[in-house]
Amino acid sequence: MVKCNHCLVKSRTMPESIEWSSEVSQIVRKFALQNAIEYHGEGQSGSVLGRVLSEREDLRSKAKSLISLVNSEVSRANLIAKEKGMEEVRFELESFAPEALDREKQQKTVGLKDLPGETDDVVLRFAPNPNGPLSLGHSRGVVINSMYSERYDGKIVLRFDDTDTRVKPAIIEAYDWIEEEFEWLSGRSPDVVVRASERMPLYIDMAEKMISGGFGYVCLCSADEFREFRISKEECPCRDREVSSNLEDWEKMSSGGINEGEAVVRVRTDMTLPNPALRDWPALRIQHAPHPIVGDKYKVWPLLDFQSAVEDHAQGVTHIIRGIDLMDSTRKQTLLYEHFGWNYPEPLYWGRVKIHEFGGFSTSGILSSIKSEDFSGWDDPRLPTIKALRNRGFSPESIRLLWEEIGLTQKDISISMATLESFNSKVIDSDCERRVFVIDPIEIEFSSDNRPDVASIPRHPEGSIPGNRNWEFSESIFIQSSDHNPGKVRLKDFADVEISEFSANIQSMDRTDDRQIIHWLPKNLSREAIITVPDGENLNRIRGFIEDFELEEGRVYQFERFGFAKIESIDDQLVSLLWLHN
């Protein structure tokens, strides 16, 4: 047997065909579902096979033959996770092997483990770049930091890392967007709000202290020249200059006497360190582009590793939660802290999370696409921004549940939007009134006079919203063309009928048998509607008739046999809706 590839175990020889007992099949299914939960829909056959053989050692001699069944069940479990969400995987596992969920509960405790170090006065921070609104990926930082802050009755700082005026410049509106989105996502206001651009005097002061202390210097080498020094582990000539000379050049940098790209301030470390990224790393550079808040007041701006390190110390940050790809930032900043004689905060890391439906988006890329009119704006329903998700009808509770589910793991994982949609369904279902939406409608006339004048349909099938939708209707109704077959059916929540081409005869108001149930709509209670459905880079539009009963703009409804959608606008001719999810 060789190592698993693409999550499936392969064998060098064809296994013999064995018809497995239902008991063995159930064991394999149990561990496949359990593994899919642990790996967020990317279960591993090798791991599943190991667990099966651990529980049933008598199967070890048949391991090769077992591979086919294991691969099949792992593929099935992963497909359920992708198409229906993790809650569906968990539901199936709980239905026949609830004890297998205990392992997940233990792992959740690990995923949301206690913070290391001193936790009496916890201070955390969430530090976005205000070059656009928050994305679903950003929301992880809001949620996880807020969760820990709440657990330890600590403080959370919202810090805008906005000291890049050239590559990813700030958008002035984004400050308010992000602050409001932070509150929406976390359910609370940040304890402190910091705009790094307004803290420039602090960074300039610390840079001067660093240069005066001899552990920072002005480097006049070009980027290519210093790259060669770094690769060869040699010190550049600028490193040995007197402090006074460095301070003179620092003054020239600050006053605009040196052009962009001609000088940087570096942190003196060790040019022989094994990690090239740590060798005399750049702390401040020249940027003459104006800033949307402070204008052209400053010519020298700190790079993120320096600015973030200084501000973390100034705010008393005790724990930093960041991506595992930023470990080098921790190492750089630790060296700077040692120079200043400070104690570095406790770092925690998480791995990347890829969401299948949103593979290649970046904030700067989205902005470019908005400017080129590929997207209508930051709330375009095809985008993974919080603005877009919120506009479609996703709740902050569902986003919190998603990140709580994933926890603080250093593993890179890949999930489907179906997982978030599953959480959102659970959160909003009890507050969503039901309505009917008929696609490709067919008109049917009642051929009998024994129909009541009013049909009373529950606002919510489980009664969480009291009251009924009382339909007063005429002789005609609409049904969906896919349901238009001559024969006996039940009109949902109304009557047993027999359809004969384009007419229907009521047979009984009570349900008398197990005939198919179809949804329907009185003609006089119908309005034309369009539902806009995001589909990758496309927007599909589905036309039909909607139930015209107490509709409200901005409200999410569940349309039976169709899914959740939000009403965007209502006029005399048309109701426009935005698709949410199944």
Predicted features along the sequence, with ranges:
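Extended, domain-scale alpha-helical bundle/helix-rich regions
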Residues: 39-56, 60-63, 377-459
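Charge-rich, well-structured scaffold segments of protease-associated domains
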Residues: 173-184, 209-212, 395, 405-408, ...
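Active-site cores that bind ATP or allylic diphosphates and position pyrophosphate for catalysis
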Residues: 209, 213-366, 372-374, 385, ...
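Short acidic (Asp/Glu) and glycine-rich catalytic loops that position anionic groups and cofactors
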Residues: 154-158, 186-187, 309-317, 365-366, ...
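C-terminal accessory/binding modules appended to enzymatic or scaffolding proteins
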Residues: 119, 450-582
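Structured alpha-helical segments in the cores of large, soluble enzyme domains
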Residues: 140-150, 175-182, 296, 300-308, ...
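N-terminal Rossmann-like or analogous alpha/beta NTP/dinucleotide-binding catalytic cores
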Residues: 4-238, 324-348, 352-357, 363, ...
